[in-house]
Amino acid sequence: MTKIKFTKMHGNGNDFIVIDEFENPVPEEKKAAFAKKVCHRRFGIGADGVLFLAKPLHTSLHMRIFNEDGSEAEMCGNGIRCFVKYAVDNGHMNPGKDKVETKAGILEVEARIEDGKTLVKVSMGKPLFDPKKIPAAGLNNFINKPLHGYEVTAVNTGVPHAVIFVDDVNAVDLMKVAPEIRYDLKTFPKGINVNFVQREGHNLRVRTYERGVEGETLSCGTGSVASAAVARYLGYTRDETTVYTAGGQLNISFVSDIAYMEGPAETVYEGEIDVDFSAL
């Protein structure tokens, strides 16, 4: 048995297990199985994903995220905020501006303390509507195309997202209708996250079905950015908007088409778990 220290964190209810690989390296070939084990909410610690804080490949701290099904994601908006808070709290990073390396690229981040809470702002890059970058079927941007009874717009904000505007997000049977779009591999070859969005003036209310979690999460950072990006593209919102989710709110802004996300990150508790890597 190997003792692995962990920190349980959440960003607006989207919860993660942080593993500091400076102290607790997890074998590369075991990461997927480890994530599935510890994320299980009955037989493990319980989380939407595992964040591995790794030694930098270049000049930045390196974040890797594995979903609860063991798949590795390119990026996670709520996850990177938790990652930055952990890094600041544990001396890997100073408050203020820095960079984090992810599979989606190197992202600029900024951590600040306000009323005793850690807020993290992340430069999420330019939302990509090119179907080759999502990926999605077709040669033209995937904008308001009819699919499974809805008008769907697709965009990549680090990971692929489908965005659907409805009158009332709470009236949507998310677990019934979202998987039809998420698993439409003819349209979205790598699968896609699915967001149902309700307009509230220039702000948005969002529910997200997450790929890899295979269910609804209380909040999705990249989904909030995707929803704001599509709303802006369609002329529904301006350069700044607040996105409300079941887990809390995120402030999304755009400067020269670059998306910025700001929101909280919180530590829940710390602990140790015994892991038999030979059995994984």
From Swiss-Prot:
The active site is at C76, C220. PROSITE patterns: DAP_EPIMERASE (PS01326). The record marks H161, E210 as: Could be important to modulate the pK values of the two catalytic cysteine residues. It is an enzyme of class 5 (isomerase). One of its GO terms (cellular component) is cytosol. Belongs to the diaminopimelate epimerase family. Catalyzes the stereoinversion of LL-2,6-diaminopimelate (L,L-DAP) to meso-diaminopimelate (meso-DAP), a precursor of L-lysine. This is Diaminopimelate epimerase.
